[in-house]
Amino acid sequence: MIDYLRGTLTDIDHQYAVVEVHGVGYQVYCPNPYEFEKERDSVITIYTFQYVREDVIRLYGFRTKEKRSLFEKLLNVSGIGPKGALAILATGQPEHVIQAIEEEDEAFLVKFPGVGKKTARQIILDLKGKVDELHPGLFSQKEEQPKPHEKNDGNQALDEAMEALKALGYVEKELKKVKPKLEQETLTTDAYIKKALQLMLNR
């Protein structure tokens, strides 16, 4: 089992980051690969989870052990697969997810792609009271909030963000509702993703 990778971030796709370790490039699927954009061509440490099924072997990666642990706990819930767990973690604010679980807020959880009322209830039943130990690590790793003054190729960054959100399971209909607001700002791809998720989850 691979616990973590430490290597050079060489490429970013809308689903994964490529980390080169001793000449080998590993595809590491992440909730939001673009959160590593500022570290491109730098050495990073990413905590991994190896997912093995008959037809697929993938590495999933996270900035902290706590986020990886939350991902693993979500995978143990009936009805939640890797794609669904990534979508839940992609908000960059996992403490909100934990709060929803502890407060039995099904209305918040069903906003994530692939999570219906039955699955939301199952998440609460399986995880309530079992994620408290993750709080210190999750809360100490505050994500940077979108900064309107950040400069980037707005159209390209927004297009990349839309593709990343589609890969997480968000449908075109949902994305069209928030895209006009995103087009009013010039942000990085990472910031566009976080902003879009905030808009969709706060509706």
UniProtKB/Swiss-Prot annotation:
This is Holliday junction branch migration complex subunit RuvA. Residues 1-63 are annotated as: Domain I. Signal peptide: none annotated. The RuvA-RuvB-RuvC complex processes Holliday junction (HJ) DNA during genetic recombination and DNA repair, while the RuvA-RuvB complex plays an important role in the rescue of blocked DNA replication forks via replication fork reversal (RFR). RuvA specifically binds to HJ cruciform DNA, conferring on it an open structure. The RuvB hexamer acts as an ATP-dependent pump, pulling dsDNA into and through the RuvAB complex. HJ branch migration allows RuvC to scan DNA until it finds its consensus sequence, where it cleaves and resolves the cruciform DNA. SUPFAM superfamilies: DNA helicase RuvA subunit, C-terminal domain (SSF46929), Nucleic acid-binding proteins (SSF50249), RuvA domain 2-like (SSF47781). Keywords: Cytoplasm, DNA damage, DNA recombination, DNA repair, DNA-binding. It is found in: Cytoplasm. The lineage of its organism: Bacteria, Bacillati, Bacillota, Bacilli, Bacillales. Transmembrane segments: none annotated. Its main location: cytoplasm. Coiled coil: none annotated. Belongs to the RuvA family. Residues 143-152 are annotated as: Flexible linker. InterPro entries: DNA_helicase_Holl-junc_RuvA_I (IPR013849), Hlx-hairpin-Hlx_DNA-bd_motif (IPR003583), NA-bd_OB-fold (IPR012340), RuvA (IPR000085), RuvA_2-like (IPR010994), RuvA_C (IPR011114), RuvA_C_sf (IPR036267). The keyword ATP-binding does not apply. GO terms for biological process: DNA recombination; DNA repair. Residues 64-142 are annotated as: Domain II. Homotetramer. Forms an RuvA(8)-RuvB(12)-Holliday junction (HJ) complex. HJ DNA is sandwiched between 2 RuvA tetramers; dsDNA enters through RuvA and exits via RuvB. An RuvB hexamer assembles on each DNA strand where it exits the tetramer. Each RuvB hexamer is contacted by two RuvA subunits (via domain III) on 2 adjacent RuvB subunits; this complex drives branch migration. In the full resolvosome a probable DNA-RuvA(4)-RuvB(12)-RuvC(2) complex forms which resolves the HJ. One of its GO terms (cellular component) is Holliday junction helicase complex. The gene is ruvA. Residues 153-203 are annotated as: Domain III. Has three domains with a flexible linker between the domains II and III and assumes an 'L' shape. Domain III is highly mobile and contacts RuvB. GO terms for molecular function: ATP binding; four-way junction DNA binding; four-way junction helicase activity.
